[in-house]
Structures are given as structure tokens and as C-alpha cells.
Amino acid sequence: YIILSGDQLYHMDLAEFLKKHQESGADITIACTAVNRADASGFGILKADKTNKITEFMEKPGSTKDISEWIIPDETRTPGAVKGKDYLASMGIYIFNANVMEECLNNTLTDFGKEIIPEGIKKYAVNAYVYDGYWEDIGTIRSFYDATLDLTGITPKFNFYDEDAPIYTHNRNLPSSKVNMATLDQVTTSEGCVITNATIKRSVIGIRSIIESGSYLEGVICMGADCYETDSEKADNATKKIPNIGIGERCVIRRSIIDKNARIGKDVSIGMGKIPEDGDYGWYHVVDGIYVITKNACVPDGTVI
């Protein structure tokens, strides 16, 4: 069994991972990567000998605990364990032999990091597979935001255009995006977008996004829309006095994640003033200074937050 995490971004050859597991004769193999002290506080950290056998495991030691004894020894350091990245952290990616997995789950234990792995080390042969490539945990709003916007860089850390590690997605059968009289700098766009006379910087524009004339976006992740609105639906919106799906005219939006199907009216300003405290404000949230516009949100004309 290969156990993967759903909130991480990384390039890994799983076939190579499986091959190393089989060659080692281990019952369980844990994918690991070198991290700094600050990151180590939130991950399971471990000790491994010269043969990559794991001898000890500690789940999320926190920021105040003395873990100096867990620093990676020089003789077992890999190229990814550069100065400052002194601790070996579990990536939350595992391979279990089938019989071992069944035995580990035939009890009341439920949490891999806190229960199953520490108990498994006591009973089974558990090895580390040290991964030196790109890996980012995107389980928080801040980490998701930073990792996503990093993709807009000229040479991003995670490269979608690597011929040796291609990324595939399903075919949506949509037209290519249309950009009319707009200025885009360090921007990635998905299929089916229509961008008109807007200025967009360092942003990711999702599928079927509609961005109207005069708008300015910077540091924005726009998730897009599930469908296009018809002319009759837009007429109905006008009758109900609600914006169409997308971003209206003359909006200024910074430091934001806009979830799918959001309706942002004309002359809306988000992220230009003083950042409010983190919290739930109805149709939007603030997390680590990042504005999160909720799915299907309706933002009236002239709104300023």
C-alpha cells in the first residue's frame, strides 16, 4: 500500500520509491525530507542510521522542546540536507507491506503520525526514503497562497514545464483564454478565461475567469467558475441587482484568494487598506493577512475591505 497526503505539492518518482522499499526488505518505508528547526516543530521528525533504518520517531515536537539530539549526523546527510536543514521530517507519505498494513489497522489506532508509525517502529522494520526534491506542505492558507504564487515566477521552484516530470490534467474541451487590451506580468491562466483591459501582476487566474475592464489584480489566486453564465442569466442578475460571476469593472484586488463562482461587482476594493484581524467576516475570511473570498460569494458594487 502506498499512502499519500492530499495537501502537499511535490515531484516524486513513486516507482523509484517503491523500488527502494522492495530492495531494502523493510515492512514500512517513510518518505522523509530535511527541514529547518522552525518547520521541524510542525512535522514528525525521526532518526535513521547509515542503512536508513529508523530508530526513533517524534510527532510534532513544537518550537520550545530541545531536539538538538535529533540533528542529522554528517555521515547520513544527503545533498538536500544543506546547512540549516538539520532535521529529518516525515512527509506523511508511506509504503506498507500489505500484511503489515492489515495488522496495523486491526486495532483502535487511527492516526498515522501520532499512533501507527510510533507503534510500527517498535514491531516492524521501518526505513527512511530520503527525498531531496521540491516538497511543500500546503495545508494552511498561507502555505497554499505562497506556493501557488511561486508558480508564477520566471523560474519557479516547482516547474510544470519539466520534460522529465510532466504534469497531466484532464481535458475540459474549453477554448483558449482571450485577452483584450490587458497587461499581464508573471501570470498563469487556465482555459476559457476572458480578460478585458485589465492589469494583472503575479497572479494565478483559474478556469473560466471573467475579468472586466479597468480592474487591477496583484497577488491574487482566482479559482474561476464552474460554468459560463448565459445572456438570460445575466439579464436575470441585472433584475436582481447582483453582479455577474467574475470580477467587475474598475476593481482593485490584492493579497486575495477568490474561490469559485464568486460575484464581485464594480468598483470593489480588496486588500488596499489596513489589514483586519484574522477572522470570519461572512462572505470573506482573513487568514495571516490574506483575504479569502468564499465560494459563491456575492460582493456588491463599491465594496471596500
Predicted regions and their residues:
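Short aromatic/hydrophobic "clamp" motif used to bind/position activated sugar donors
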Residues: Y1
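Active-site acidic Asp-centered loop
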Residues: L4-G6
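Conserved core of the sugar-phosphate nucleotidyltransferase
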Residues: H11-Y94
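Left-handed beta-helix
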Residues: E75-G84, A98-I305
